[in-house]
Amino acid sequence: MKLLEERILKDGHILGDNILKVDSFLTHQVDFSLMREIGRVFAEKFAATGITKVVTIEASGIAPAVFTAEALNVPMIFAKKAKNITMNEGILTAQVYSFTKQVTSTVSIAGKFLSPEDKVLIIDDFLANGQAAKGLIQIIEQAGATVQAIGIVIEKSFQDGRDLLEKAGYPVLSLARLDRFENGQVVFKEADL
């Protein structure tokens, strides 16, 4: 997605060897016009697949997932990272390691929001090592629902997340694919959408 790549080049900041900071439009402050376009692009791609739910993980996946779900006219569910006393029965959980935060969290979704009839589109802000998507897949499959595809806003193609997910049989479609960081600049691979 050219608009996203241009925004990454303009406002993204490289930290170290493998971190891209995009807090001015995605991971802290949210550019709603960009998120609306991201949602439109994902929805256009998946409109004919019968998606019934969009699932993400808090926090930075919520904005692109909301706009995708809105464009598809289906509910969006986000997995919670913190235990909530109001979520006390029928909870589906998985362990997820965060590459950026370098911590493992138990993420959860109330089972009443997913059913075996659901066809789920996972949307997330970043794909690095695939652990967030893997955890969401475990939760979705605990409910007996089907993962149709995984939509990623920014993929770090130099890490193994895509390979892990595709080898497990899940299609991955990314709007921006980072090939590498070179001389303080992002070098892109051809995106899927």
UniProtKB/Swiss-Prot annotation:
Q: Which domain of life is it from?
A: Bacteria
Q: Which Gene3D superfamilies match?
A: 3.40.50.2020
Q: Where does the sequence pass through the membrane? A: none
Protein's cellular compartments: Cytoplasm
User: What are the GO cellular component annotations?
Assistant: cytoplasm
> Reaction catalysed?
XMP + diphosphate = xanthine + 5-phospho-alpha-D-ribose 1-diphosphate
The pathway where this protein functions is: Purine metabolism; XMP biosynthesis via salvage pathway; XMP from xanthine: step 1/1
Q: How does it assemble?
A: Homodimer.
Family assignment?
Belongs to the purine/pyrimidine phosphoribosyltransferase family. Xpt subfamily.
Give a short account of what the protein does. Answer: Converts the preformed base xanthine, a product of nucleic acid breakdown, to xanthosine 5'-monophosphate (XMP), so it can be reused for RNA or DNA synthesis.
The entry's protein name is Xanthine phosphoribosyltransferase
What organism does the UniProt record list as the source?
A: Streptococcus pneumoniae (strain P1031)
Lineage runs: Bacteria, Bacillati, Bacillota, Bacilli, Lactobacillales
Gene giving rise to this polypeptide: xpt
